Amino acid sequence: MTLFQSLPSSVLQAGAIFLSIIIEALPFVLIGSIISGAIEVYVTPEKVYTFLPKNRLGRIFFGSFIGFLFPSCECGIVPIINRFLEKKVPSYTAVPFLVTAPIINPIVLFATYSAFGNSFKMVLLRALGAILVATILGIFLGFVWEGLIQKENRLAYHEHDFSHLTKSQKILQVFIQAIDEFFDMGRYLVFGCLFASIVQVYVPTRILTSISATPLLAIVLLMVLSFLLSLCSEADAFIGSSLLSSFGFAPVLSFLVIGPMLDVKNLLMMKNYLKTRFIWQFMTIVTLIVLVYSYLVGVML
């Protein structure tokens, strides 16, 4: 008798689900890592600053939508935002970029489209939720918040200067940065896939049914889960789609919108660079908007 034959059927089922999710997600994580590495090497805050509109509202919308052209995983987005702020990119441009770049970039949008059975519904609603949060945060920072959002005694950011490298050296650096990011994201992906497979196999259906019967509770539960799992945005859609039958559309939408904006690893990085008062207000605004938005989507659908 082989080892696999001696295992309970539930373990084999959970293992099969785990592998199916991770195999689907890995190509997107790999592509996202390479693109993120290219941005690290070739795109500088100075280049971004030259394209900023003159008026404040224009800069808010610029920050909200520029993530489509410059995709960045949330795993390393906070140091990038700090770098933007150091180069005098306004907070009402940098923070909207923080919340939308990991969601509205083409890799994540296509991953979401693929994970949800080639359907545009989740793709559009996820992107709309991110843009809504970014716009409100931008307006808050541009017209309500006074002063800087950075800490005075913030962690010094070590800036890599790739400008002096040759073309071949830059390409090599792209892959070095990509490998670092791939393995950094991979560990969170493994835990997320493991959790999703365990939920589907071992959590009794009656418990999941009772939770999904109370939409607000299900939304809050998956928002907390997304915060704790700290998944990368290139892979979270595959975890979310596996939870769809257990929790419903609106809770999974909240899981996908809030995760790239607010999770454990991002919060820890924010504490190194940003004021505590701003972090609390950021958390409050993001949580309330995602909660209300997801609930209203659930009511209307």
What does each model-found stretch correspond to?
Residues 35, 40, 70, 79, ...:
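Short, flexible micro-motifs
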Residues 35-66, 208-213, 239-240:
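Membrane-embedded helical hairpins/re-entrant loop segments and their flanking transmembrane helices
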Residues 24-25, 63-68, 228:
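Interfacial helix-start motif at the membrane-water boundary
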Residues 1-34, 46, 50, 124-223, ...:
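Selected transmembrane alpha-helices and immediately adjacent juxtamembrane segments
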Residues 24, 28-31, 40, 44-45, ...:
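Short helix-loop boundary/capping segments at the starts of domains
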